[in-house]
Amino acid sequence: MTVNSIGEYTATPRDVQANFNGMQLLYLYWEEHLMYCSALAFLVAPGMPFAEFLEQVLKPAIHAHPDSAKIDFSQALWQLNDQPFTPDYAASLEANGIDHKSMLRLNTPGLNGIQGSCS
């Protein structure tokens, strides 16, 4: 089968951290809670303490889910970029190793979505 090419394709990424005015993107996926069908994307300051991210960014973002009020973050299991992760709540996102376009996964044992449906 013949393939016709339109030539070399070059692109300049537009989502590099330098284009975010000192901020960075952070993705977060709450496992077994498919009411949120994909990871949530947040624009955050690298110097924001992890505890502040939870209180001021994450909790308001997931507030609509019935399980959100039941989360015990001290029992949460975390992954950062597919690796086990134990956050230092007092340290900044940057000091926790969370950089531009990092993926956090949140697992809340015992909370399995609306009526256990994983949604």
UniProtKB/Swiss-Prot annotation:
Pathway: Aromatic compound metabolism; phenol degradation
Gene Ontology BP term (one): phenol-containing compound catabolic process
Entry keyword annotation includes Oxidoreductase: yes
E.C. number(s) listed in UniProt: 1.14.13.244
Domain of life of the source: Bacteria
InterPro entries per record: Phenol_hydroxylase, Phenol_hydroxylase_sf
Pfam family, one: Phenol_monoox
Catalytic activity of the protein: phenol + NADH + O2 + H(+) = catechol + NAD(+) + H2O
Function as written in the Swiss-Prot or TrEMBL entry: Part of a multicomponent enzyme which catalyzes the degradation of phenol and some of its methylated derivatives. DmpL, DmpN and DmpO form the oxygenase component of the complex. Required for growth on phenol and for in vitro phenol hydroxylase activity.
Protein name: Phenol 2-monooxygenase, oxygenase component DmpO
